[in-house]
């Protein structure tokens, strides 16, 4: 009987386990998850904290009980602490009893995800300072935000999660400050003009501090944060959210001798294989094939994690499937503005010395004679050699994301800008 062990029970791991179970009814499939939570959707956490819904269980795609009932040997609160690739064994610690035991595998999948970057700031570990990375973070922050004494919240960072948290906390009536070291938001996910557009849109909704570096935090007599000190001033705060980004959670792989990228991601091929025989990886701990750049890249998104998890399951059970590729397609609702991106940005094309051209337009989301129209900002990046579309970015209050999906489909299919312009899409004035 084939023995498959999966380390990690969230997106990629549970997608792989469920698919492997469907493909091979006889295989023994064991999932080790160090927390008590499995199959939860991280994308919903800001909105749960912000009170858009109150039942945390709706973020769980499949309960532990349902997983076990399907024939998967799920072990929660069990952490794999060592991989013996030579003898195909893992060393596991039961976190409730602290006892250790070994388990053998024929195929091993590492899906340990990513972890929040914690900045080197004085007093960063005092009370009422947290990340929003794990399910437990969301549960804890939800309870904290019920405290009416928590009025002023500072968010460190200005990426997708930071903006979503800001939106959520404003929904709760909190006063929100965003503190960002650079002069833009979203990092390199959008070109600067889309960062500038979003800054203009949100600056009246949050206290936005760009080009400002946090130096330290100060605690009150209960060891909870009371103030935040930057290189430009001191601010009274009741809570601090750390949202400056993530890094691959790959220490276990590193200790095993698995090759890592410069940023610490587990390097895999298009089949999900690492450099060590019978060991695979998927999700936010690993690289993923970039369809535009034709190389492995680090794109930590739930969509890619779930797809790669399902694909790797085929290979764990005897197949030889290759992943068709990610475009890094992502979207966000920045208060009332939708932003979406797919493929590569102009800055990325320039950085990689790709011969490219761009076209940017501002238009209306529907016919001008029909009421309540809104502006749409659209940018395409395309090859100067063959005019194939390389990337797209769209922003607007309505319809930006669905239009970006059309661009993603065009990139995936290898369409040129000319062919995109001739697509027979639906039209009506509203």
Regions found by a protein language model. Give the residues of each.
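Beta1-alpha1 glycine-rich phosphate/pyrophosphate-binding loop at the start
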Residues: 1-77, 166-190
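Short hydrophobic core segments
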Residues: 7, 103-113, 235-245, 309, ...
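Flexible, glycine-rich terminal cap/loop adjacent to redox cofactors
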Residues: 7-11, 15, 21-26, 34-35, ...
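Catalytic nucleophile loop
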Residues: 10-13, 159-162, 313
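A Rossmann-like FAD-binding core segment of flavoenzymes
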Residues: 26-28, 69-96, 103, 171-270
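Rossmann-like dinucleotide-binding cores of NAD(P)H-dependent redox enzymes
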Residues: 59-60, 152-154, 160-216, 299-305, ...
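Glycine-rich dinucleotide-binding loop and its adjacent helix/turn
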Residues: 110-172, 208, 262, 268-270
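FAD-site-proximal beta/loop scaffold in flavoenzymes
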Residues: 125-149, 224-227, 234-315, 406, ...
């Amino acid at each position: 009987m084939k023995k498959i062990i999966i380390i990690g029970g969230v997106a990629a791991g549970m997608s792989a386990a469920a698919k492997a179970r469907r493909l091979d009814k006889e295989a023994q499939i064991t999932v080790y998850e160090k927390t008590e939570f499995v199959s939860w959707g991280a994308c919903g956490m800001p909105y749960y904290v912000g009170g858009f819904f109150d039942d945390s269980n709706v973020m769980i795609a499949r309960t532990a009980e349902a997983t076990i009932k399907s024939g998967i040997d799920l072990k929660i609160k069990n952490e794999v602490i060592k991989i013996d690739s030579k003898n195909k064994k893992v060393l596991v610690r039961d976190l409730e009893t602290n006892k250790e035991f070994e388990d053998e595998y024929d195929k091993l999948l590492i899906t340990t995800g990513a972890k929040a970057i914690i900045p080197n700031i004085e007093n960063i570990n005092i009370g009422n300072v947290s990340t929003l990375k794990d399910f437990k973070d969301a549960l804890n922050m939800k309870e904290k935000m019920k405290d009416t004494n928590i009025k002023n919240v500072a968010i460190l960072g200005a990426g997708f999660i930071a903006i979503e948290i800001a939106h959520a906390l404003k929904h709760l009536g909190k006063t929100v400050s965003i503190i960002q070291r650079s002069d833009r938001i979203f990092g390199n996910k959008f070109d600067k003009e889309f960062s500038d557009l979003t800054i203009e849109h949100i600056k009246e909704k949050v206290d936005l501090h760009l080009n400002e570096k946090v130096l330290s935090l100060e605690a009150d007599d209960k060891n909870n944060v009371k103030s935040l000190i930057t290189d430009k001033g001191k601010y009274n705060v009741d809570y601090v959210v750390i949202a400056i980004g993530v890094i691959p959670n790959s220490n276990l792989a590193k200790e095993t001798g698995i090759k890592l990228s410069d940023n610490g991601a587990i390097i895999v091929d298009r089949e999900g294989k690492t450099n060590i025989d019978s060991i695979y990886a998927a999700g936010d701990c690993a690289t993923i094939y970039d369809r535009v750049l034709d190389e492995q890249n680090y794109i930590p998104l739930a969509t890619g994690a779930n797809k790669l998890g399902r694909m790797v399951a085929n290979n764990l059970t005897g197949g030889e499937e290759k992943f068709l590729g990610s475009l890094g397609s992502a979207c966000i609702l920045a208060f009332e503005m939708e932003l979406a991106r797919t493929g590569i940005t102009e800055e990325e094309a320039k950085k990689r010395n790709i011969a490219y051209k761009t076209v940017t337009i501002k238009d209306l989301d529907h016919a001008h004679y029909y009421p309540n129209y809104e502006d749409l900002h659209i940018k395409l990046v395309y090859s100067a050699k063959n005019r194939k579309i390389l990337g797209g970015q769209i922003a607007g209050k309505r319809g930006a994301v669905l239009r970006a999906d059309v661009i993603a489909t065009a990139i995936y299919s290898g369409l040129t800008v000319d062919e995109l312009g001739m697509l027979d899409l639906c039209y009506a004035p509203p």
